[in-house]
Amino acid sequence: MKHATLLQPHRTAFTVRINDNGAWCWFQDERALIDPANNTLLVGSVAAPEGLGGAERGGNIEVAVLDLATGQSQVHVLHERLESDDHNAPALLIRPDGRYVAMYARHKTDNYSRWRVSVRPHDASEWEPEQVFDWTELAGGRGATYSNLHWLEAESRVYNFVRAINDDPTMLVSGDDGTTWSYGGKLFTRPKVGYVNGYTRYWGNGVDRIDLITTDHHPRDFNNSIYHGFIRGDALHDAEGQVVSKPLLGSTGINQDTLTTVFRAGTEIDGDILTHAWTADLRGQGNQLAAIISCRANDVNGPLQREQRLDVDDHRLLYARFDGTDWALHPLAVAGPGLLPHEQDYTGLGAVDPNNLDQVYISAPVHPGTGEATDHYEIYRGRTADGGASWSWTAVTENSGMDNLRPIVVPGDPSVHAVLWFRGSMSSSQAYTAEVVGRVSRLNESDRTAQTR
């Protein structure tokens, strides 16, 4: 079924609706990728019953494939009506043989990590039957959530990072490119506080290293700091390269505060006291990393009940840059009040350009360049020439009649610059009327050279 039309064709750029009913959370990756072998962009999302297609479509786990030459897209269903919840968005991977792997899980409401492999290379139109990894015995029947797929060539191994077993970051591993999976151990563990332990974002170089940033707990329940480490050679290291957990495979997990602190709760920047941090995005190039972190500014409440309102409802986005040795932390933008009344620490989020760490996209109800409040969340592009100390901003969307949320800058082909988001209205992670849209441009050689400077 086709759901997209080319809206604004140009010679080198276009804006497009890719899926007319979909949204995602931000703790799965890759949620979108470009396959240069067939000049397509793939993006996974979850349909909601409030959107087009109604209850018959609500809860579908979908992959939309955008033809970058024509601007037309096709939506393929991985699992019909699994569960209407944006946490269930699939993670995508291109195997060395060109076939796709998609993995997805429900939001703590059953005990399975699910996956499908495409029948043919570079073709998402047909998939092998769904398979499952059953966490019931390992997790005591308390559910599993999220999928994050990272292939390391040096190990001939794919990792899938899942939230399971005490709601800790855990691992599945595959030695056959995602055809079969086995339990790989835990990254972190600690006594549980509130809802969950360790919200983690990952970035892998595809060769021998996976970097990660993680929280203590959910920011509603705990005044989080943010920590950084990396996986290499069956060991977990801190930012300085010191081994903190080995062997990693089969590990029972360590306390994440053993890693290097990127953001310490209570940090003061420009007179604002910043607390209750959350991980938003992480990308890398060479030995450098860039991360976006959300946090509360000048909070007076501390831990919250689920329906409790913040007395000072003021969130910020921070930009953190790692030069291979040290982290530097900079203010990025005002993020506004909490996005949802019962999710007091939700923001519109932001994304780092995987091909240019000096470029970010954010969603905010305040123009980051002028400070002017807007009726809806808009998308802005930010660029820095000094490692994040200062920013220039351009509006990507303006005067919108609906919110524009959770941007992604799509990896896979440095010659294609694609930023995606979903737009519409959201009352909860389970109820939304939203469509997946994006802006795509093909960069010429001078553009690519400028990005790598």
Over which residues does each language-model region extend?
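Extracellular, repeat-based ectodomains that mediate carbohydrate processing or recognition
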Residues: 4-453
